[in-house]
């Protein structure tokens, strides 16, 4: 994948940096693997906004992605690499020898025409899916299962990968992209390699309109609201928030408050917590 920038013909193109889509080999999706999906627009089943700043955007078709990789021992050929509007990663269209077609997350380096396979006896090659017990130490993996047979739930975004650190008993220690070291059952499956399209972190939308195309509505600062709408609101002119620290619209502490439960049962599987991020890297945006 590569990225392309633009000359400053307009204010929107001055800082615009987008993907060149050079790795995409086929534009139209496989019709048997797409379904229509209702856009929730940040509402729940009662129509109440539960996630702010969502709505609008371009109409999309949802691609059915195979996160389970449960066709063990059946060889598949990579027929195409395609764009997916619902994620930053690309999709690889697989043609299995028994005639079935499936989408998987595109592993970095996998080319059209290459063969991939899943199963405990699969060779140690990028794009193949194996149980963690069969993957060598130090290998990079993605699309990692938390529970055997449920499908990959971790390490699925563009450019992400986890590292196999150790094996002991029924568990394998993985170093996740967040630097957290976590134990996972050895029978859980993972795909070798890292997710492709790692250059997406270098892109820039360039203008507010592109954010609207993605279905993101504007975020209004709390300090410019009325006091009935936000704890930061009110006052004469540009008044301070009048609190020791920023809070959410519902009065809860913002920017750094830990939201994970202290007595969560899965805490025993976390060997090392993720590294803390500084305020500078996290950003001090007014909620």
Curated annotation (Swiss-Prot):
Residues 221-287 are annotated as: Disordered. Keywords: Ribonucleoprotein, Ribosomal protein, RNA-binding, rRNA-binding. Residues 258-287 have a biased composition (Basic residues). It comes from the Bacteria. GO terms for cellular component: large ribosomal subunit. GO terms for molecular function: rRNA binding; structural constituent of ribosome; transferase activity. The keyword rRNA-binding applies. One of its GO terms (biological process) is translation. SMART domains: Ribosomal_L2 (SM01383), Ribosomal_L2_C (SM01382). It holds the Pfam family Ribosomal_L2_C. SUPFAM superfamilies: Nucleic acid-binding proteins, Translation proteins SH3-like domain. InterPro entries: NA-bd_OB-fold, Rib_uL2_dom2, Ribosomal_uL2, Ribosomal_uL2_bac/org-type, Ribosomal_uL2_C, Ribosomal_uL2_CS, Ribosomal_uL2_dom3, Ribosomal_uL2_RNA-bd_dom. NCBIfam families: rplB_bact (TIGR01171). Belongs to the universal ribosomal protein uL2 family. PANTHER family: LARGE RIBOSOMAL SUBUNIT PROTEIN UL2M, RIBOSOMAL PROTEIN L2. One of the primary rRNA binding proteins. Required for association of the 30S and 50S subunits to form the 70S ribosome, for tRNA binding and peptide bond formation. It has been suggested to have peptidyltransferase activity; this is somewhat controversial. Makes several contacts with the 16S rRNA in the 70S ribosome. Part of the 50S ribosomal subunit. Forms a bridge to the 30S subunit in the 70S ribosome. This is Large ribosomal subunit protein uL2. It comes from Synechococcus sp. (strain RCC307).
